[in-house]
């Protein structure tokens, strides 16, 4: 693994799941971590766990669906930290959105968090990182973003947005000193997947997924996809002709 070069990091969606795990993973390696999320009690419990281990995690109450407030708060954190070295846009929500009964409220909730919230989180520090000629932006997308999955129109589309957003940032920021990484998890045990009522092949333990994420981020990988058993066929499905993909997708409903 490459040498850890981060002094400070912000991880959104750190109340549980991958965000919580990554915040602890970074803190245990000497990084001062700002753990952001909507549920302050869970963040305070995370801080206490970190303190018991002799490391630093600072809770930050933040609702990324409120874009203007998110921009303001993260910019203030950047100034307080003397420049955030790593920002991980991890906050996300799921939920089914069957096109036959497409509830706008649910669609909007997914877009507000997964699209607007992620873009605001990363945009808040991007100009400062470019000016400093250093920094690392990470977006947590999903393997579900490669094709439109049945019953997940809003979720798949929101993750497709983030994937393309991160790719464009990576191209634009080449040579600036700012690195860009996009994470593509498959199914990971978390609050997000606990309510799923459909098969989840190659379901991963959270700590295993966090280890893959953390190592990929530190290496500066452009993309980190896991588990490979699901990542490989998912990427191959990207080039399937529509009739073949549609037939396969119908079987997965």
UniProtKB/Swiss-Prot annotation:
GO molecular function: oxidoreductase activity
A single cellular component GO annotation: membrane
Family annotation (InterPro entries): NAD(P)-bd_dom_sf, Sc_DH/Rdtase_CS, SDR_fam
Pfam families xref list: adh_short
Keyword terms: Oxidoreductase
Binding site for substrate: 142
Positions of transmembrane segments: none
EC number: 1.-.-.-
Top-level taxonomic group: Bacteria
Family: Belongs to the short-chain dehydrogenases/reductases (SDR) family.
Protein name: Uncharacterized oxidoreductase MXAN_5909
Organism: Myxococcus xanthus (strain DK1622)
